């Protein structure tokens, strides 16, 4: 009846709030916590029952319906499964439930897709097509450091050490790390900074006054337009990161060092690049040997 449902919802929401606070204390970032919250609230909304009453069948059915309705990818469904798993495992640890209903739901096999990288030629074409000294510096910095675009836009002039050819970036979850750039990037960055007339501390600013710090969307748009002009498929900042990782593994860089360079919290994330290399080998074998 309505009253019981209302009581269930109140106690479910209370437990969710405690869980999200625990995640915050563990150091999860605000966007992650919001994603956890909205994902779990969806379950409460579609299957309103007491936390202790959820069964493995309920969760399986929910995931199946969700996938069908939203035509979701396996990766999305596995992310939702992981969030449910984290929530119910926490409830079990804190003795709110006897056993997590997600425990018997296995990881969704996602099948590693071989995602595209930029060829050396692509990167040279992009460099050659730059009409603005700033854009050349952006491409060089992305290509040689493999940093995230969200890290790039936060950089200030002071974060760059030209002598050491390195800079400090603030990664996901406010973690600082050092990244390194090559001689070509150093020269192009210096040229760009020398050409600037503004006093903004930001490393990259808009081309026109009032010379505001560039935003992620601005950099993405710029790269996409350059790619279109050159007929290079889907040029976006993350592709430079993926390219650097793939090249590093190709050349035999130890996976732990690559993890540090890319700022991955979990080595699984870095290992995906190594696995992709492996599937490239498989594709090549099928193509040439059968």
Please give the residue ranges for each predicted region.
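N-terminal core-binding DNA-recognition domain of tyrosine recombinases/integrases
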Residues: 2-6, 14-114
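Alpha-helix N-cap/helix-start motif at helix boundaries, enriched for small hydrophobics
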Residues: 33, 84, 138-139, 146, ...
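Short pre-functional
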Residues: 41, 85, 136-150, 166-167, ...
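Basic, Lys/Arg- and aromatic-enriched nucleic-acid-binding interface segment
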Residues: 97, 112, 120-149, 173-175
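Catalytic-site neighborhood detector that most strongly recognizes the C-terminal catalytic loop/helix
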Residues: 117, 172-173, 262, 266-287
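C-terminal catalytic core of tyrosine-transesterase DNA break-rejoin enzymes
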Residues: 140, 144, 241-265
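Conserved tyrosine-mediated DNA breakage-rejoining catalytic core shared by Y-recombinases
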Residues: 145, 150, 154-191
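Active-site/catalytic core of tyrosine-dependent DNA strand-transfer enzymes
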Residues: 182-232
């Amino acid at each position: 009846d309505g009253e019981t449902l209302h009581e269930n919802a109140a106690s479910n929401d209370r437990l969710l709030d405690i869980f999200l606070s625990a995640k915050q204390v563990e150091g999860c970032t605000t966007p992650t916590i919001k994603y956890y919250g909205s994902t779990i609230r969806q379950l409460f909304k579609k299957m309103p029952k007491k936390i202790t009453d959820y069964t493995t069948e309920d969760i399986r059915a929910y995931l199946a319906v969700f996938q069908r309705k939203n035509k979701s990818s396996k990766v999305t469904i596995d992310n939702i499964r992981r969030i449910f798993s984290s929530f119910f495992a926490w409830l079990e640890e804190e003795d709110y439930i006897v056993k997590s209903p997600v425990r018997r739901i296995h990881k969704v096999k996602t099948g590693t897709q071989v995602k595209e990288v930029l060829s050396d030629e692509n990167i040279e074409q992009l460099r050659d097509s730059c009409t603005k000294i700033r854009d050349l510096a952006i491409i060089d910095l992305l290509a040689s450091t493999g940093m995230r675009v969200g890290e790039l836009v936060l950089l200030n002039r002071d974060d760059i050490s030209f002598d050491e050819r390195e800079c400090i970036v603030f990664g996901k979850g406010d973690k600082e790390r050092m990244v390194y750039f090559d001689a070509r990037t150093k020269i192009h960055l210096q040229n760009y900074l020398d050409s600037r007339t503004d006093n903004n501390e930001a490393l990259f600013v808009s081309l026109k006054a009032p010379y505001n710090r560039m935003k992620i969307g601005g950099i993405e748009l710029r790269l996409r337009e350059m790619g279109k002009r050159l007929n290079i498929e889907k040029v976006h900042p993350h592709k430079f990161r993926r390219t650097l990782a793939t090249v590093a593994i190709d050349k035999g860089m130890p996976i732990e060092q690559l993890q540090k360079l890319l700022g991955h919290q979990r080595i699984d994330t870095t290992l995906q690049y190594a696995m992709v290399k492996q599937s490239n080998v498989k594709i090549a074998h099928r193509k040439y040997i059968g």
